[in-house]
Curated annotation (Swiss-Prot):
This is Exosome complex component Rrp41. GO terms for biological process: gene expression; rRNA catabolic process. Its main location: cytoplasm. GO terms for molecular function: 3'-5'-RNA exonuclease activity; RNA binding. GO terms for cellular component: cytoplasmic exosome (RNase complex). Signal peptide: none annotated. It is found in: Cytoplasm. SUPFAM superfamilies: Ribonuclease PH domain 2-like, Ribosomal protein S5 domain 2-like. Catalytic component of the exosome, which is a complex involved in RNA degradation. Has 3'->5' exoribonuclease activity. Can also synthesize heteromeric RNA-tails. Component of the archaeal exosome complex. Forms a hexameric ring-like arrangement composed of 3 Rrp41-Rrp42 heterodimers. The hexameric ring associates with a trimer of Rrp4 and/or Csl4 subunits. It holds the Pfam family RNase_PH_C.
Length: 244
């Protein structure tokens, strides 16, 4: 990121990106609610070539007890990339990046979850990245929201997430791995559409003030598309495609 020299054509003269998409076209997204019988809630997402499984457990007692909060519940998130999720086998031990993304996702989810409804307890979110292809934090955040809803955790809204970015001096939606590595900017955004609130906003790269505003708008519009797929996943599980 940050304007590194590209080794491939990221955008051709017709405005087509390296994977054939237009500037405002997301990758293929498939979300499924449920699937893990031993979890209180779960979900599976394919976001481009990302494949991520999420399990939610709780609310349940906090151990050790002194870590509990008498006024509110605790949300705990673990983001983990399987050793086979990337081309070169990854060390199975938690990396600094995994710890950082766990914290980012936790903080993006907290405004959505009504933790005050279950004091002295914890909700654990386990995120397993089975295959990675750029944008895993957005895909994981999206899937985690569905899994929390599937678990019946009280929520103000679901958080939908996608990344906007800048490639070949053009603002784009849904940055893939090649664009992330060789593009000019990457902006992951998490958004609660019903409340019109952003819960995640990061920027890697350099943007002008105008590009910054455009990236946010493109990202928010993309989150609204993702949100419809989140709702569909829950509707498909609980209502069998009946209704909206």
């Amino acid at each position: 990121m940050g304007g590194r020299e590209a080794t491939m054509v990221l955008m051709d003269e017709n405005g087509k990106r390296c994977d054939g998409r237009t500037v405002d076209e997301p990758r293929r997204i498939m979300i499924k609610a449920g699937g893990l019988k031993n979890a209180d809630g779960s979900s599976y997402i394919e976001f481009g070539d990302n494949k991520i499984l999420v399990g939610v457990f709780g609310p349940r007692d906090v151990h050790p007890k002194h870590m509990s909060d008498t006024d509110t519940g605790i949300l705990r998130v673990r983001y983990h990339m399987e050793p086979f999720s990337v081309g070169e086998r990854k060390n199975p031990a938690p990396s600094r990046r995994e710890i950082e993304i766990s914290k980012v996702i936790k903080e993006a989810l907290e405004p959505a979850v009504m933790l005050e409804k279950f004091p002295r307890t914890a909700v654990d979110v386990f995120i397993e990245v089975l295959q990675a292809d750029g944008g895993t934090r957005c895909a994981a955040l999206t899937a985690a929201s569905v899994a929390l809803a599937d678990a019946g955790i009280p929520m103000r809204d679901m958080v939908a997430a996608i990344a906007a970015g800048k490639v070949a001096d053009t603002v784009i939606l849904d940055v893939n791995n090649e664009e992330d590595q060789a593009g000019q900017a990457d902006m992951p955004i998490g958004y609660m559409p019903n409340l019109e609130k952003i819960t995640l906003l990061q920027l890697d790269g350099v943007l002008t003030p105008e590009e910054y505003k455009k990236c946010i708008q493109v990202g928010v519009d993309g989150c609204k598309l993702v949100y419809e797929l989140q709702k569909k996943a829950l509707n498909d599980k609980y209502f069998g495609n009946k209704g909206d």
